[in-house]
Amino acid sequence: MSQLIRNFLIFFLFFSTNAFSADTEFFGKFVQGGVIIGKNKLAKKVFFDDLELELSDEGYFIFGFGRNHKKLSTLKINFSDRTETLNLDISKSEYKIERIDGLPSKMVTPGPELYERIKNDRLLIGKALGKKYKSKILPRNFVWPAEGRISGIFGSQRILNGLKKNPHGGLDIAAPVGTPIKSIASGKVLMAEKGLYYTGNIVIIGHGYKLKSMYIHMEDINVSEGDFVKQGQIIGTIGMTGRVTGPHLHMNVYWNRIKINPELLLEDKK
């Protein structure tokens, strides 16, 4: 059984008028930023808030909740002889808010000469996140991408000179330049690019089932777009490329293009 399954609790939820099958298992936290792995070997189709989920041959499926996900969602499972519906109660997460005033304006908002470059970078990233990769096996355990100190957490937000910036969408691990970066799970490299304004050197990997991981501010990139990688494979090294103040890895995890909390997905830190 995977570390994820060993560490996570099976949560008891509020059932709809239809009794939900005892054969359905859930692993994960029903909380904003959380990700759930479900399993039912008899399921024919599964829907999360009307979105049809991909089912593995073993009956596994995965879905997640963004930073500000609504309180209630619905999961529907179609069987050969019936349909069952479950109402999901999503707990609210608390996020750190930090205010910093007196910064030079260029550190808060980039100048207009950079707008076109930033726009093109975002288009490249959006294209990669929109790519589909199918896998027969749904990843159920995930390894930490690098050794180091956690220097930034999911959901936190800065207010710079009174201007609200986008919430922090991932996990920061501070470590010296050259520290190896590993893929958290097996998958296909959807993007491997250097020199983007905000992200610097960047790799995006698709793991199937609408799940993707992004690694940015890298020094070296050891993979190319289209490569297949194994879990734990070194894909590059930590750097300080892009818009950073020191060497670190910033990693995002996306489900269905929604950022989820990487710490709720990864194994216990060794």
Model-identified regions with their sequence ranges:
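Surface-exposed, glycine-biased beta-strand/turn segments
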Residues: 87-199
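Short hydrophobic beta/alpha edge segments that flank linear recognition/processing sites
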Residues: 173, 202-203, 230-242
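Cationic-aromatic interfacial patches
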Residues: 21-94
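Zn2+-dependent peptidoglycan hydrolase active-site motif and core
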Residues: 184-219, 247, 252
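N-terminal signal peptide c-region/cleavage motif recognized by signal peptidases
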Residues: 16-18
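Residue-level recognition of beta-strand microenvironments
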Residues: 153, 176, 192, 218-221, ...
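Sec-dependent signal peptide recognition
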Residues: 2-11
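Short, well-structured beta-strand-loop connectors
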Residues: 180-191, 223-238
